[in-house]
Amino acid sequence: MMSSDQQFFLKWNDFQTNMVTSFRHLRDEKSFTDVTLACEGQTCKAHKMVLSACSPYFKALLEENPSKHPIIILKDVSYIHLQAILEFMYAGEVNVSQEQLPAFLKTADRLKVKGLAETPSSIKREG
């Protein structure tokens, strides 16, 4: 007689790869996008869930302003940096020229992008 409370562990081996690929595809196709980011007179569509997961700044902003499809106007953000930040959020990597790197990192820090922004725990203390 088999015990009915026996548990089985099931694992999707390429789950993370699939999720990254799927979110990138959804963004590229503009499928299910639910937020528009605007800067320098241009716009980018994105997903609230991705922005919230990758940035406490966007998470707080979206929680404070719950609307079906908000348009977030970003002052003092270059469109090229916004595109690169979204690429980083959706793919986990991005190419940025050496010339653009300092300004890009400053923008990423201002928008609190995880993996790019300095957090108190990642700041090295000199002792």
Swiss-Prot record:
Its recorded name reads Longitudinals lacking protein-like
Q: Its gene?
A: lolal
Q: Where would you say this protein principally sits, based on its record?
A: nucleus
The UniProt function text for this chain reads: Required, together with Trl, for maintaining the repressed state of target genes including homeotic genes Scr and Ubx. May also be involved in the activation of homeotic genes. Binds to a DNA Polycomb response element (PRE) at the bithorax complex. Also binds to polytene chromosomes at several hundred sites, many of which are shared with Trl and ph-p. Required during embryonic development.
Location in the cell reads: Nucleus
- Which residue intervals define the domain BTB in the entry? 33-98
Q: Which Gene3D superfamilies match?
A: Potassium Channel Kv1.1, Chain A
Subunit note: The BTB domain interacts with the BTB domain of Trl in vitro. Found in a Pc-containing complex.
Q: Which GO terms describe its biological process?
A: dorsal/ventral pattern formation; embryonic development via the syncytial blastoderm; heterochromatin formation; larval lymph gland hemopoiesis; negative regulation of DNA-templated transcription; positive regulation of DNA-templated transcription; positive regulation of transcription by RNA polymerase II; salivary gland morphogenesis
The terms under GO molecular function for this entry are:
DNA binding; POZ domain binding; protein homodimerization activity
Q: Which domain of life is it from?
A: Eukaryota
Q: Which key words are in the record?
A: Activator, Chromatin regulator, Developmental protein, DNA-binding, Nucleus, Repressor, Transcription, Transcription regulation
Q: Which GO terms describe its cellular component?
A: condensed nuclear chromosome; nucleus; PcG protein complex; polytene chromosome
Organism of provenance? Drosophila melanogaster
